């Protein structure tokens, strides 16, 4: 399964992305969660991105259907206290 490595995270930060949309979880370590207790400090990519003010929208579907020429992403998360993430409804508007 895909994941972001540190080189990819550094590229995202260096190019000053404001948000990243993925169709997979960003950290490789997330794959260990069913097998063992995974500690917050192990989410190196997660912290690299968030510490630079970049948001993640992950586990999306059908990203290949977006042309990318003139696309607007609208993501509306549920309000949840004490979390750094939440379920959301995400819509891509492709302005041909």
Predicted regions and their residues:
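Active-/binding-site microenvironments in catalytic and ligand-binding cores
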Residues: 1-96
């Amino acid at each position: 399964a895909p994941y972001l490595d540190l080189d990819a995270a550094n590229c995202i930060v260096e190019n000053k992305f404001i948000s990243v949309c993925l169709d997979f979880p960003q950290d490789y370590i997330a794959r260990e969660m069913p097998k063992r207790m995974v500690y917050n400090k192990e989410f190196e990519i997660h912290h690299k991105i968030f510490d630079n003010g970049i948001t993640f929208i992950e586990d999306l579907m059908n990203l290949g259907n977006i042309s990318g020429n003139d696309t607007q992403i609208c993501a509306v998360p549920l309000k949840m206290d004490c979390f750094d993430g939440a379920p959301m409804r995400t819509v891509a508007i492709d302005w041909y």
